[in-house]
């Protein structure tokens, strides 16, 4: 028997408890600008920390390989119904443990080793699961990549020509470092013309799409994959949305194809997050995410920094640091010293190595969750520019850190 007041983390494992407390304090004290990170609600965290973690539930609602699944069936069906409604999908699988596994589920269901796939080049903003040589997708399939034009938008004409030439089995849209709107309808027409399946990885944009502030790929794609964290602000996990005709193949690919028992406590967190995402406050939040990103980008450009593509139309932006004679790796470090958390990121045709880079990627979802609006976004952009103007001046770093502390104290994550 477990007595709740005796089996607490601080009593059982002080080392882990201390690390959790320190991470909690870091999240409160630092301004989080990593585009793929966000803060979940206490309700989502409570679902993830529930007794559902104890339950094995191989299979799907109403068709399990274990007994005692009547209540986890309720939870999973709620998650399925809510995410379908949220995005207007015909069918959904909420069991993938990550966005990468959601992508793998589509590959496993619809492709054979050696098939040709088309995805956005990682070097120009794509994701490693879309065909990077070291990733499973790059090892199992023949990969052809599309990229950007001179204006640093997707080169749709070149994409179409490449698809006509290579006749891929699957075309993938979606990115991890691309700030503009993606024309999903146009790519869908290309896929149809060459007889390819069309998959969209909307992991970065899912929250914006749910709120209607970014184009929805669901009406145009055979498959739409996503993570459930990032802009969607749920637990770490994945989802596959699909046309009804593909539901059986996808479900079989996830279980028993690439996964065993689903993580029911995480699926509960997904269900809660999907309900939160249906609220008017979530729509207002996503509208503010876009406003804050735009305010940051405009301020950084006014301070002499180049934004890749010249603007942002979403939550994310890439900052070209070459004019400041500082690498992405160095910028990540000095901004971190100032309690501003970013990640180094390659820019298109980056001359630096992947672990060095010439840029940083910034995103507005987490700071917007804190309650930041345009005024704070402008302040944050100025603080970033202040650090990058004098990256080795300790007094400058300390001054910025003090201003960050004022903002984070005014806008706590968890009040």
Curated annotation (Swiss-Prot):
Gene Ontology CC: one annotated term: cytosol
Keyword tRNA processing appears in the UniProt entry: no
Annotated positions for site Plays an important role in substrate specificity: 229
Keywords: Amino-acid biosynthesis, Cytoplasm, One-carbon metabolism, Pyridoxal phosphate, Transferase
Binding of (6S)-5,6,7,8-tetrahydrofolate, residues: 122, 126-128
GO molecular-function term, one example from the UniProt record: glycine hydroxymethyltransferase activity
EC number: 2.1.2.1
UniProt cofactor(s): pyridoxal 5'-phosphate
Entries under Pfam families matching the protein: SHMT (PF00464)
NCBIfam families named among the record's database cross-references: PRK00011.1
Subunit structure: Homodimer.
Role according to the record: Catalyzes the reversible interconversion of serine and glycine with tetrahydrofolate (THF) serving as the one-carbon carrier. This reaction serves as the major source of one-carbon groups required for the biosynthesis of purines, thymidylate, methionine, and other important biomolecules. Also exhibits THF-independent aldolase activity toward beta-hydroxyamino acids, producing glycine and aldehydes, via a retro-aldol mechanism.
Protein name, per record: Serine hydroxymethyltransferase 1
């Amino acid at each position: 028997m477990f007595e709740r007041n005796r089996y607490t983390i601080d009593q059982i494992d002080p080392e882990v408890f201390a690390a959790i407390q320190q991470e909690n304090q870091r999240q409160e004290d630092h301004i989080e600008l990593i585009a793929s990170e966000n803060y979940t609600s206490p309700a989502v965290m409570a679902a993830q920390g529930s007794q559902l973690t104890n339950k094995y539930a191989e299979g799907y609602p109403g068709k399990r390989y274990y007994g005692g699944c009547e209540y986890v069936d309720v939870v999973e069906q709620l998650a399925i119904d809510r995410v379908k409604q949220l995005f207007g999908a015909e069918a959904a699988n909420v069991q993938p443990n990550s966005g990468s596994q959601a992508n793998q589920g589509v590959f496993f269901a619809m492709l054979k080793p050696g098939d040709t796939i088309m995805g956005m080049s990682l070097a120009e903003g794509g994701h490693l699961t879309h065909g990077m040589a070291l990733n499973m997708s790059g090892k199992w399939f023949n990969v052809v990549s599309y990229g950007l034009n001179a204006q640093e938008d997707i080169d749709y004409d070149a994409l179409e020509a490449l698809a006509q030439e290579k006749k891929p089995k699957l075309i993938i849209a979606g990115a991890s470092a691309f700030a503009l709107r993606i024309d999903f309808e146009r790519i869908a027409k290309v896929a149809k013309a060459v007889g390819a399946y069309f998959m969209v990885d909307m992991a970065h944009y899912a929250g914006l799409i749910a709120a209607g502030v970014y184009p929805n790929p669901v009406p145009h794609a055979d498959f739409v994959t996503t993570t459930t964290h990032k802009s969607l602000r749920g637990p770490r996990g994945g989802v596959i949305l699909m046309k009804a005709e593909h539901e059986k193949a996808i479900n079989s690919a996830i279980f028993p194809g690439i996964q065993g028992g689903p993580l029911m406590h995480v699926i509960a967190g997904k269900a809660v997050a999907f309900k939160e995402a249906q609220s008017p406050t979530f729509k207002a939040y996503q509208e503010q995410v876009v406003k804050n990103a735009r305010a940051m980008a405009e301020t950084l450009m006014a301070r002499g920094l180049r934004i890749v593509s010249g603007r942002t139309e979403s939550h994310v932006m890439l900052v070209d640091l070459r004019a400041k004679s500082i690498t992405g790796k160095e910028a990540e470090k000095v901004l971190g010293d100032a309690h501003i958390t970013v990640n180094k990121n390659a820019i298109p045709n980056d001359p630096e190595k992947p672990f060095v880079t010439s840029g940083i990627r910034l995103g507005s979802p987490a700071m917007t969750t804190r309650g930041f609006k345009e005024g704070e976004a402008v302040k944050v952009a100025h603080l970033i520019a202040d650090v990058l103007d004098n990256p080795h001046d300790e007094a400058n770093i300390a001054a910025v850190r003090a201003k960050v502390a004022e903002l984070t104290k005014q806008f706590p994550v968890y009040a």
